[in-house]
Amino acid sequence: MKRICSVYKSPRKSEMYLYVDKREALSRVPEALLVPFGAPQHVFDLLLTPERQLAREDVAKVLENIEKQGFHLQMPPGEEEYIEHLPEELLRMNDPL
């Protein structure tokens, strides 16, 4: 299954993205989701195929969600994931001497 998708970012929550079918745009996204998400800001369009790799999402799940519900919501990574990627010297800044 191939699908041209539009990706929107949330102005309220860093690293929160909404994937939708480009032809349908935001028409199938519930208002109850758009209120906390904020006014979606278009980032880019891309062709999704089962072979394509996404950085933080399973492309099969994204395609399935768009097919079934009209959108896929990518949540920001958890705080633990941010901490794992910090340089060691930053992690030690608050350590007692």
UniProtKB/Swiss-Prot annotation:
YcgL domain span: 3-87
Pfam families attached to this UniProt entry: YcgL
PROSITE patterns given in the database record: YCGL
SUPFAM superfamilies according to UniProt: YcgL-like
Protein name, entry field: YcgL domain-containing protein PA1295
